[in-house]
Each structure stands twice: as structure tokens, then as C-alpha cells.
Design a protein with these regions (language model features):
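Aromatic-lined carbohydrate-binding surfaces of glycoside hydrolases
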Residues: 2-152
């Protein structure tokens, strides 16, 4: 990629491991967090907010290996002069978070004809939780992987 002029690649590996840390800090139980993530093959759809829980959960081993892999990826990107674009909080929340906050009007998405239990909830950006979770996500990411300039 670097040889072809790509200098700002996405670096989304291990974003679920970082999100898990954030949700634990927000008071969710591990089993509720694990029920939120899809299996590895479906993570692109999970990250886009299309699908939750399908073919999951992710194991502790998976999360640890993703953290190791992301360190290697980021080191190499930086060696090649690339500026990684890291993930940020996009507003998708576990069902357990939505259930804990009935005072918030979450948007409940539907996608691909999947049963309601697999659909995502979106936290409205005007709520104080959006900023709090977003800040926690970046703090956790930078604590693990170091300072970053660009987030998506």
C-alpha cells in the first residue's frame, strides 16, 4: 500500500477489544458485552452498525491476539511513513446499555431481514453519554496503542 501512495490506511483491528474495555467502564457485564459482538467473519457488518451478536461471541484469546496484531500493524505502518486512521466511537451500543437507559430515545436499526435481537441501537449524539463514551474509547485506544492523529 505504501508503495502505491496509500499513506492514511484504516487501522480497525482490535477495536472490539478496546470497546469491551469501554463498556466495562460504563458498568456493563462481560456477558452483555460479549453478546454485542458478532463472530470474526461478521465484524465488518458489526462495525457498520448492521448486525450484533451474530455468530459470536469473540473469545478472550481472539481479543488478545487482535491486540498483538494491531501493535504489529501500527508499528509497520508508522515505519513506512503512514498515518493510521484509528476507529472511534460511532454511536452503536449494546442492547444492555440501551435497556439500562430507558430515558434515552435510541434509534433501533433494522438490516438484512435479521431478527430484532441482532439489530443495533444507536445512541443519539446529543446525549452526554455519546461524548463520554467517545472520549473513553480514544483514551483506551491511545493507552494501548499510543497517540494517534486521525480517527474515524
Amino acid at each position: 500500500m505504501a508503495l502505491r501512495g496509500v499513506n492514511m490506511p484504516l487501522a480497525t483491528v482490535a477495536s472490539e477489544a478496546i470497546a469491551e474495555r469501554v463498556w466495562l467502564k460504563m458498568g456493563l457485564k462481560e456477558e452483555d458485552i460479549r453478546a454485542f459482538f458478532t463472530g470474526p467473519a461478521h465484524l465488518p457488518w458489526h462495525r457498520m452498525g448492521n448486525l450484533n451478536g451474530w455468530d459470536g461471541p469473540l473469545t478472550d484469546g481472539w481479543q488478545k491476539e487482535q491486540i498483538k496484531l494491531q501493535h504489529k500493524i501500527l508499528n509497520r505502518m508508522r515505519e513506512l511513513g503512514m498515518e493510521p486512521i484509528a476507529p472511534a466511537f460511532a454511536g452503536f451500543v449494546p442492547t444492555a446499555f440501551a435497556e439500562r437507559h430507558p430515558e434515552i430515545q435510541f434509534k433501533h436499526l433494522e438490516w438484512g431481514g435479521f431478527d430484532e435481537k441482532y439489530n443495533a441501537y444507536v445512541l443519539p449524539p446529543e446525549t452526554p453519554y455519546f461524548k463520554e463514551i467517545g472520549k473513553l474509547f480514544i483514551e483506551e485506544w491511545e493507552k494501548e496503542f499510543g497517540k494517534n492523529t486521525y480517527y474515524l
